[in-house]
């Protein structure tokens, strides 16, 4: 700490909000960040964990108290199942330096305030901090707030409470459950299916939903039918053509065979249509509630295509605060909630804004409140809303990037709309007769837009009805059937899940919680159980289907939707003090552990790696589907006597024409390297990165033609490397990422220089003379990280000024285990932090890394602290 002593030490999770809270509380308070959890179940067994606290404990000196003995029989679980499921927590290795800083600061403080997030995860972090700091129970001051505003902060500090152990036990039970399932099932899957296969209590159920939807799509048999769509020209307005449909005697839509539809077209075309019935009806449409975590993820995915993880990262930044007019301000309330309710203060403020912008008639007297539709809505938090409705999207637009503004606009508009009147619409229905045939016309018009003047919810799979205005056509009015057409249709299966619709399905079944949705979906994609089709929808891979088959066959109850939802209800009961967490775990373990033990010996080793198929090899022998290093393939069942093999796509069904297996130009041509001398030819081959051309004499000839960079990724100018260009002349060039099948821009002196930057634009940054690149957020200097505005049109040769240097812009965020600099407690301290460095252990040897990179990586881990399940590989 920079101060020798402080009266009050406040511990929060994220450094981004520390400076804001410290400013609100005044000089008697110092705020420091824990960067998420500081203690957890160890990731390795005690014997293997070289970096664990136990392994690094110093030698005892004379007079030291006896060292605590490690619990026996814990193994890699770190949970004593024989002693009430007592967990063995350890300080997270990369948090030891951070905890030491907090401990030093706490020693000189008169009071320590635990201000971690207000959900179960935050409550558990507060408890772990209190335990690690050895704060007496009577002195544990716990404060929570749902928004980072001065009023909310001061109010929470005026009413501290103790740590809610029911919430802690609910989180602890979930953590142990996930450890038991992950560490017991994952090794079994890795042995029986593929290395690195994993199972999780919730992720496996999410996988089952995706697999079952995929199989339903494959098994679906479409039904073909036709409808008859017509256009009627009324006698009162010959220039107007009113759309109509052929219906049955009761007004039902007719779905008929194509020949029946064609006969109807011939029968009614040119006929006289007479209005036999006219009805008017009105409909009220209520506004949708303010956002919860799941509905925000769904809507951001539908309207902007954001993945759940991206949405949560953007919402986290809006919650923690952005710099507005030189002052960091929290823009939204806490973003992990399943409650759609608003406080009375928020409702009153929303009414003021509505009255000003839309008039007094747009204010709903008394406001609106909403009840959660979630099966197992958790603690009574507020919905996600702006911290101030007076802070409109237009007012904050200049302080946010495009993606942040889109998310803030969604939240502001949805919350405002939730307090506005219903939409009122009128529908006119006309029934016509043409001889013995009956036609129907529907036309809907808006009478009062109500809340839709501000916000209209997106749809997953349907379009909004188009509005139409009909002329005054009383019964008996006549017209001519001007057009008639038989329109062919076919029934369609339910579509593949998108991330938003999968979140919706999980929530509908009561599976998962606000803090876990994004992590669940990320995990099943990381393990390659699920990938994305051309429309960005989730589809199960062969590996995912195989893992799902094993789990549903041998562990049916534990991947059952009802069972998993029931476990969530039991955890909720623990959080509410209605159930004992040890009893919940004991009941689960009593059935789970014997089943895993039995299946470990009864399932055949090759049962899920070799599967029969309907294919025959060139000699007529049956072929088997087998799982190899690079995925699934077909092999002759007589291998090794007959070694014929065929590639299989990652997803079942993509092997058919029109699937994802490409046809590469050049296959069959002579190999440029050995064709003349040895007769080698170019053949289409496959690796774990996809299909490529290579010599068919491999490994004798290893020739692979260099892939040509597609036109859209080429640069028409030279861009110097911002790191080594001046001294060594390195240039940024497009390089292919084989795994993701895309291109990135890196120094052509690799591996001497490993610089990677966004795509160069050809413009130069005036302040530092480096090339300006362009990423998803706009222009960025490739040297100093300053954000700049890019004008429209040609950029090559332009010199653009502006932007503030950002030393964290290109800091590494993955691949290193780092400790955050204990003296960097606020994002506003970036420039000072960038000059320091911490020494961390890497493979047993000291290694210096920039402290800025340490902070960046620690912030990333802090933002991810709330989600995920255990797995052992």
For every predicted segment, state its role.
Residues 1-175, 184, 247-248, 252-255, ...:
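Intrinsically disordered, low-complexity regulatory segments
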Residues 2-7, 19-20, 186, 219, ...:
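Basic, low-complexity terminal or inter-domain segments flanking catalytic cores
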Residues 6-7, 117-118, 193-198, 280-289, ...:
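Conserved short loop/turn motifs at secondary-structure junctions
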Residues 15-18, 35-40, 118-122, 146-151, ...:
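Conserved nucleotide-binding/hydrolysis micro-motifs of P-loop NTPases
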Residues 20-24, 101, 105, 124-132, ...:
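Alpha-helical scaffold elements adjacent to nucleotide-binding pockets in ATP/GTP-utilizing enzyme cores
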Residues 101, 148-230, 280-284:
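C-terminal or mid-to-C-terminal helical accessory/interaction module adjacent to the motor/catalytic core
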Residues 253-290, 477:
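Metal- or metallocofactor-binding catalytic centers and their adjacent structured scaffolds
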Residues 275-278, 286-300, 326-335, 493-505:
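Short acidic, hydrophobic short linear motifs in intrinsically disordered regions
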């Amino acid at each position: 700490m920079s101060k020798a002593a402080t009266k009050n030490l406040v511990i929060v999770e994220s450094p981004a909000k520390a400076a804001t809270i410290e400013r609100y509380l005044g000089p008697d308070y110092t705020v420091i960040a824990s960067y998420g959890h500081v203690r957890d179940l160890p990731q390795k067994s005690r014997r293997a964990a070289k970096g664990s606290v136990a392994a690094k404990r110093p030698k005892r000196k004379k007079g030291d108290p006896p060292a605590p003995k490690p619990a026996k029989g814990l193994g890699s679980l770190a949970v004593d199942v024989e002693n009430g499921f007592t967990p063995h927590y350890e300080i997270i290795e990369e948090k030891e330096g951070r905890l030491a800083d907090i401990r030093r600061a706490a020693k000189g403080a008169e009071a320590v305030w635990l201000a971690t997030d207000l959900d179960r995860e935050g409550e558990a972090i507060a408890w772990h901090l209190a335990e690690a700091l050895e704060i007496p129970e009577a002195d544990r001051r716990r404060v929570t707030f749902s928004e980072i505003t001065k009023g909310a902060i001061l109010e929470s500090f005026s009413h501290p409470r103790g740590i809610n152990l029911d919430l802690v036990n609910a989180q602890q039970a979930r953590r142990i459950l996930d450890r038991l399932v992950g560490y017991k099932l994952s090794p079994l899957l890795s042995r029986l299916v593929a290395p690195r296969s994993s199972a999780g209590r919730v992720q496996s159920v999410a996988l089952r939903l995706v697999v079952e939807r995929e199989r339903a799509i494959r098994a679906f048999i479409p039904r073909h039918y036709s409808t008859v769509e017509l256009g009627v020209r009324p006698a009162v307005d010959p220039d107007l053509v009113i759309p109509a449909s052929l219906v049955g005697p009761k007004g039902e839509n007719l779905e008929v065979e194509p020949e029946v539809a064609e006969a109807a077209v011939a029968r009614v075309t040119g006929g006289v249509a007479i209005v036999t019935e006219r009805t008017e009806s009105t409909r009220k449409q209520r506004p949708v509630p303010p956002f919860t975590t799941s509905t925000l993820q769904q809507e951001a995915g539908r309207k902007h295509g954001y993945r759940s993880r991206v949405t949560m990262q953007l919402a986290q930044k809006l919650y923690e605060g952005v710099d507005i007019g030189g002052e960091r301000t929290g823009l939204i309330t806490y973003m992990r909630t399943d409650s759609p309710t608003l406080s009375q203060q928020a409702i009153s403020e929303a009414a003021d804004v509505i009255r000003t912008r839309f008039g007094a008639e747009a204010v709903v007297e008394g406001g609106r409140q909403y009840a959660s539709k979630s099966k197992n809505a958790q603690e009574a938090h507020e919905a996600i809303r702006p911290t101030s409705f007076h802070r409109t999207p237009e007012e904050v637009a200049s302080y946010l990037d495009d993606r942040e503004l889109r998310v803030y606009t969604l939240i502001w508009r949805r919350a405002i709309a939730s307090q506005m009147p219903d939409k009122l619409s009128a529908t006119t229905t006309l029934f016509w007769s043409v001889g013995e045939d009956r036609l129907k016309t529907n036309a809907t018009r808006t009478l009062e837009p109500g809340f839709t003047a501000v916000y209209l919810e997106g749809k997953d799979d349907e379009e909004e009805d188009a509005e139409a205005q009909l002329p005054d056509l009383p019964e008996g009015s006549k017209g001519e059937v001007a057009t008639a057409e038989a329109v062919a249709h076919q029934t369609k299966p339910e579509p593949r899940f998108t991330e938003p619709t999968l979140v919706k399905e999980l929530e509908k079944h009561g599976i998962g919680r606000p803090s876990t949705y994004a992590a669940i979906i990320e995990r099943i994609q990381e393990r390659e159980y699920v990938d994305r089709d051309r429309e960005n929808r989730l589809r199960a891979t062969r590996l995912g289907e195989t893992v799902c088959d094993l789990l549903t066959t041998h562990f049916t109850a534990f991947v059952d939707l009802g069972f998993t939802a029931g476990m969530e209800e039991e955890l909720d009961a623990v959080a509410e003090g209605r159930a004992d967490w040890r009893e919940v775990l004991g009941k689960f373990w009593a059935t789970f552990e014997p089943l895993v033990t039995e299946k470990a010996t009864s399932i055949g080793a090759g049962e899920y790696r070799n599967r029969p198929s309907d294919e025959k090899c060139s000699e007529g022998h049956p072929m088997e589907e087998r799982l190899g290093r690079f995925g699934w393939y077909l092999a002759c069942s007589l291998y090794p006597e007959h070694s014929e093999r065929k590639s299989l796509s990652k997803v079942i069904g993509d092997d058919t024409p029109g699937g994802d297996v490409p046809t590469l130009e050049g296959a069959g041509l002579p190999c440029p390297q050995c064709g003349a001398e040895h007769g080698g030819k170019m053949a289409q081959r496959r690796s774990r990165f996809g299909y490529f051309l290579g010599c068919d004499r491999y490994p004798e000839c290893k020739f692979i033609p260099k892939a040509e960079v597609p036109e859209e990724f080429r640069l028409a100018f030279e861009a110097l490397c911002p790191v080594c260009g001046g001294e060594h002349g390195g240039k940024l060039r497009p390089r292919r990422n084989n795994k993701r099948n895309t291109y990135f821009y890196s120094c052509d002196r690799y591996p001497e220089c490993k610089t990677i930057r966004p795509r160069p634009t050809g413009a130069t940054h005036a302040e530092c003379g480096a090339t300006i690149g362009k990423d998803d957020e706009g222009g960025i200097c490739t040297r100093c990280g300053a954000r700049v505005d890019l004008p429209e049109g040609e950029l090559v040769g332009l010199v653009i000024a502006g932007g503030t240097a950002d030393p964290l812009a290109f800091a590494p965020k993955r691949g290193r285990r780092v400790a955050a600099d204990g003296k960097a407690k606020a994002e506003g301290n970036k420039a000072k932090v960038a000059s320091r460095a911490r020494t961390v252990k890497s493979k047993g040897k000291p290694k210096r890394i920039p402290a800025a990179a340490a902070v960046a990586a620690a912030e990333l881990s802090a933002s991810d602290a709330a989600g995920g399940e255990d797995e052992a590989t």
